[in-house]
């Protein structure tokens, strides 16, 4: 590939890395909010945060695709090896630092997502246990509730017309 083509693609790749960095920060903020909502038991916030998180993931996906296309444009493979080669060709420590920061943010997001998964599983388990306790209590007392929340007694005893 000609040097001028590589040089022309470099500013776009560098600018893309800066935009990716901002997008990762937004995703990390959304994950922090989601984690805190789970810790605080604020389930009503989760749908909004999930929508925000999904939008950020789509943005990141688009940015990564753009970066891959930029690497292809300069004759490199669209992967980690291609990125490392491009960074080596640039020879600028600030570009390496930006790339390292992006990789660190990705690892941080993965770790946060795993913690969120554990918190969700804990909440679901706690809810299942509470539901089981309520169902067992209702069964043992012979009482159940209808859709309106009114007590419904079972017909296990003698009919009222029996002597």
Question: Where are the language model's segments positioned?
Answer:
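Extended, charge-rich alpha-helical scaffolding segments
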Residues: 2-87, 96-97
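Short terminal interaction segments
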Residues: 86-163
